[in-house]
A protein has these predicted regions:
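Two-component/phosphorelay signaling modules centered on CheY-like receiver
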Residues: 16-33, 98
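The feature encodes the CheY-like receiver
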Residues: 19, 34, 60, 88
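C-terminal output helix
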Residues: 17, 90, 108-117
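Alpha4 helix (beta4-alpha4-beta5 surface) of REC/receiver domains from two-component response regulators
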Residues: 66, 87-102, 115
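Non-catalytic signal-transmission and effector/linker regions of two-component phosphorelay proteins
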Residues: 1-10, 111-122
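Acidic catalytic/metal-coordinating carboxylates
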Residues: 37-40, 63-66
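Active-site beta3 strand of CheY-like receiver
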Residues: 48-54, 59
Length: 122
């Protein structure tokens, strides 16, 4: 059963394959909004805060950490899961400073992604 359109999960990643993976993992059970750049992510979140945000760091426009900082500066407390191929500790420390729910490294684990969605959204 899908969650209501009032409570979307946003997936922000510029890799079409990753977006398709999220659709395969969560699309049957949740309303997903796929976004491929930081500018659109900020604009869409300003209009409607998601119930959960999966956010890549390396995206066009403002990067994922800049998107995260923007949300927190506006007082938006959406649960954010950073999903990245970057291994540098500095990125994780910055993300943790902004209170991310989880910091995950690609490749993605289906069970972990589904459990996060169940825990945060339901």
């Amino acid at each position: 059963m899908k969650n209501s359109q009032e409570d979307p999960i946003f997936i922000v990643d510029d890799d079409q394959g990753i977006l398709e993976s999220f659709d395969a993992m969560l699309g049957d059970d949740y309303h997903l909004i796929m976004i491929d750049n930081g500018t659109e992510a900020i604009e869409r979140i300003d209009l409607k805060s998601p119930s959960l945000l999966f956010l890549d760091i390396k995206i066009p426009g403002p990067n994922g950490l800049e998107v995260l900082a923007n949300l927190r500066e506006k007082g938006i407390d959406t649960q954010v899961v950073v999903v990245t191929a970057l291994a540098q500790d500095q990125y994780q420390k910055t993300a943790e400073k902004y209170g991310v729910y989880k910091y995950l490294h690609k490749p993605l684990d289906v069970d972990e992604i589904q459990e996060i969605a169940r825990t945060v959204v339901n």
